[in-house]
């Protein structure tokens, strides 16, 4: 006979960190946009993606979806005391500029904007061209 289950674990409340300065990493691909807000060492405080905000399919790649994802991540980071961020943008997607603007609109002060998109030195073969 199976032993009776012990009491369910209480969900632990997220501890509130007091971090005023951090980094915002925006990865914008052709299919999705992911916004991660970290402290200066790179430990993630909050993140959000276009898909996680509620968009599916081709709507994930829109600038509006990137805007909502950035607002959501900024709101969570401000709960930890975040006030100023340096932005690192990666990828060719359409949500790059919109995500940066919505971070500012959410109340985070943007210190610097860096493009860290990786450039291939003749590495992998790129996908074939679309014929529409």
UniProtKB/Swiss-Prot annotation:
Keywords, alphabetical: Ribonucleoprotein, Ribosomal protein, RNA-binding, rRNA-binding
Gene3D superfamilies: Ribosomal protein S11
Keyword Ribosomal protein: yes
One GO CC term on file: ribosome
PROSITE patterns xrefs: RIBOSOMAL_S11
BP-aspect Gene Ontology terms: translation
Residues of the signal peptide: none
Subunit structure: Part of the 30S ribosomal subunit. Interacts with proteins S7 and S18. Binds to IF-3.
Gene encoding the protein: rpsK
Protein name: Small ribosomal subunit protein uS11
């Amino acid at each position: 006979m199976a032993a009776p289950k012990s009491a369910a674990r209480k969900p632990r409340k997220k501890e509130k960190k007091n971090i005023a300065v951090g980094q915002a990493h925006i990865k914008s691909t052709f299919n999705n946009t992911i916004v991660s807000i970290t402290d200066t060492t790179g430990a993630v405080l909050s993140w959000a993606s276009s898909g996680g905000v509620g968009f599916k399919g081709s709507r994930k790649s829109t600038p509006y979806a990137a805007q909502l994802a950035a607002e959501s991540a900024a709101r969570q980071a401000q709960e930890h005391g975040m006030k100023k961020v340096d932005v690192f943008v990666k990828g060719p997607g359409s949500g790059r500029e919109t995500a940066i603007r919505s971070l500012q609109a959410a109340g985070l002060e943007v210190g610097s904007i860096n493009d860290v998109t990786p450039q291939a030195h003749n590495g992998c073969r790129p996908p074939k061209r679309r014929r529409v």
